Amino acid sequence: MSFKVNWNSLETEPLTNWTKELLTSALNSGKSPNILASNITIKDLNFGKIAPDFEILEIGELDRDRFRGIFKIDYQGDFHLTLHTKVQANPLNIYYHNSLEKEVCNCTQDEFITPNFLLSNEQFAIPLDLKLSDIKINGIGIIVFSKSKGLTLVFRNDPLDSIKVSSTFDTVQVLANFLQKQIENQIRDLFRETLPTLIHQLSLKYLSLDNNINEIKSKLSQQDSVSMTNNELASSLKLFDDEENEFPLIYSSKNLQKNMQLFKSRETFRLSVPKFKNIVQRTRLDKFTKSYPNLLNSLYANNVDLQHRYVNNINHNNNNNASSTGIPIELLLSHDDKQHYDKTDSLLKDISSIQANNFYKYSNKDAPTKPKRRRIKVHKKNKSKHDETTTTTSKPSELQNVDNTFMESRSISPQETIDTVSTLIESVPMTRNVSSNIKSPTLDTLSTGSSSAASSQVIAHPTPKRAYQPNDTTTAATTTLNKENHIDYIKARNLYQDFIQMSQSPGYYDKVISNGGGIGLGNNNGGNYFGLERTISSSPIKHLNKDKKSINYIDTSKINEKLNQFRFDGGKNNNTNDNNSKNFRPGFTRNESNGQQGILFEAFNFPSMTAAATPPPPPPYC
């Protein structure tokens, strides 16, 4: 594989000047020999008209941003280079400086005393011009190219075959032979060390712009640090336009060609503007948006009915310059016309398949992952809607009736718990779930004095109440009656607590207080609510617990005999006493014999409670 090099492109003044500067800095780097009386400068540089021949022998690595290969170069052209310098012609001076370097260390050279010979210290410089021409190169080299690191060139062999050296001392044969040998050795060192460095810097100049930009920024920052006048500031801004600047800003030729091609293509009066690859033009943006595949277009393509149904809607959105790529909400809603709209499941499947195809198209095929999507449950019933209707708070009139009435007496089955009987003055929504088979007790109104018509009470969370707060809308008579009933209940409750504490089973009292607190705040504080609650038993034999006898068992028969002595009806309800004593559940009823309100415990069928009455025993231990 071989290719030709456009050698004429190198004949440019900027490249020639830049090459001269690089060669000058390279030749004068390091310590100059004592035979030279001045620095080396490049007087003439010409690349010639004949290009070298390159032949690629092997390609080890080839990619967009890197390349590594072995090539062969053969050059027999008309390249010539002229160097100018001054040579020391006084041999005593040369010998004097050479002896100082060998005998005396450079660090102590100023302190060492030497004889001051006038003849040896005098310099006698002669100008010298060296011309290098007729260069013949034949060698094998290795090229390593990287877009970020530039180009590196290394030769395997000595590529220099011959070179012609001509100077101002050609008339002296001894000096001509000496210069020929010395320059050949220096050129071999040039191909071995200097030329790879020059090529590397040249490649960085045209491939990487970061270094030039960083150098310009550093130079600008140095100039800004020094106080400058307006004229100096204006001159510093011309740094980018100055052709003689040390660090000119150079753009990539490839990018410049693309920009020029785009610019020239618009300098036309043609109606059809030429297209460019991977470029979206503003004049064609509308067509590009319509033809671009999206979710809505895919749905219309898969469903013929949707095309006829929403074609007017799409035209309306396009006329209003609105985005029609969104999915209308009507597609997912069900209407009366099931033939066209009752396709929610199929639409969701189409949307899922389209999104999955797009996801797997751009994802990694080696390690595919499932897309994360949200699950939509269509036609799901709202279960909390029924709970909200049952847990709504009562009206103010109903709250007033709750405050002014008491519970109607009724028998409680073993399956029901004490929580079914509300003991609240003011109803509050209850957070826990209650079984639907538990019915709320009825309420009695004070105006009628009967328990026939009553509304169901809402099961609510107990709220502590320490002081009686009547409603402003109630009448004075109702308020007075409520206070009297409340005082009677407080007396009965206190009497019940005193009786329990004076009984022979204090352990049972402590157990009820500690375990039967129920729900709510202030369970153990006096006057918080109407009665003590029991903990709900989850044992499968909870209905048989009343037959068990524990250490804290209380003989209710003896207590009944004591309580019958304080009855006011003279044993009127003795027949029902035994039957009702089986259900040891506290309840409330109205005493209709004397027309006054009172609190009775259903287990003993006790009528109205007075100051001399004794409360019934507590519920059985379980």
Curated annotation (Swiss-Prot):
Transmembrane segments: none annotated. GO terms for biological process: mitochondrial genome maintenance; mitochondrion-endoplasmic reticulum membrane tethering; phospholipid transport. It is a multi-pass membrane protein. Residues 571-583 have a biased composition (Low complexity). InterPro entries: Mdm34 (IPR027536), SMP_LBD (IPR031468). CDD domains: SMP_Mdm34. It is found in: Mitochondrion outer membrane. Residues 1-204 form the SMP-LTD domain. Residues 362-399, 568-592 are annotated as: Disordered. Residues 390-399 have a biased composition (Polar residues). Keywords: Lipid transport, Lipid-binding, Membrane, Mitochondrion, Mitochondrion outer membrane, Transmembrane, Transmembrane beta strand, Transport. Its main location: mitochondrion. Belongs to the MDM34 family. Component of the ER-mitochondria encounter structure (ERMES) or MDM complex, composed of MMM1, MDM10, MDM12 and MDM34. HAMAP family: Mdm34 (MF_03105). This is Mitochondrial distribution and morphology protein 34.
